């Protein structure tokens, strides 16, 4: 009887110990999951978080922004059509040195285009680069995303792809292009993108031959000035009330570039990037620097790691400046709730246009930010001008 009593007590103690361990494990798992959930809410918000529709474009072209915004307001899931509309509007108007100005040729006088579009939901990306003979490159980039398993097509093969889908081929170079090239040639081909060659590219047009390696001058200096109205790339970001992002970029390429050069507009993460779980970003500036550092991608990942948009924007620009002290350009960052910020370097100030948002629902406004090199200032919203006139819409297929 004594032995049976002892066994019964041991069994009860064993069951009690097992029960306590089970409760402890469940409690630990609960608190771990709670911490993970709290962190996710901090980073990404909850389903109940109100999202404000937003349309942002780089530089100060309000007409193109308003056309894109009007498309975004037409109905459900219009972010893709909105950013395409913005790119098309700038392509067919005079936005900086874009195609309408026909003043951004390569050193052989050719006008080639590049464009890209990214879906923040699927993370699919479509782009073309070095494409000649087709005006609306953004439509071809969108076709790469929709109809192929590739991400980027380049050169004459991109033109051939566009023709196969029915896009009209046209001769883009005209008298204005030839005049721009003639002036450049008469000025000793300045500026240009050669280095460490003979004769000196700072004084001569070439042809060039490589210098011996011991004569190379490794530091690269920024000679390609980017100012208001004197740039070749624009980017658009659209966010709808469901939290869906699309970003797009279109460019005629750096003026007097070496033929064959691919720019940041076609490189994922350099000029544009978006992820619906986190947010989106667009960048503009010295494309060769942007391609080396992928600032749009870095900005989104900085927000994923917990930074606010203003912190992410400034961090990215400061990182670029650490490696490229003469960099000029900017980044605009938007989180998944529509909160935006921008930072820049190397300019007096950077302009971008915003439509939508919580306080100013239907008016494009030019935002201005003083660049970090001079004022160490970051912008995070606020109206700077109202542009209520909406120009005639262009149809987006």
Curated annotation (Swiss-Prot):
An example Gene Ontology molecular-function term: N4-(beta-N-acetylglucosaminyl)-L-asparaginase activity
Keywords: Disulfide bond, Signal
Coiled-coil boundaries: none
Signal peptide residues on this chain, from the entry's feature table: 1-22
GO cellular component term of the entry, any: lysosome
SS bond list: 90-95, 189-205, 344-371
InterPro entries in UniProt: Ntn_hydrolases_N, Peptidase_T2
Family matches, as Pfam families: Asparaginase_2 (PF01112)
PANTHER family in the record: L-ASPARAGINASE, N(4)-(BETA-N-ACETYLGLUCOSAMINYL)-L-ASPARAGINASE
Similarity annotation: Belongs to the Ntn-hydrolase family.
Full protein name: L-asparaginase-like protein GD25160
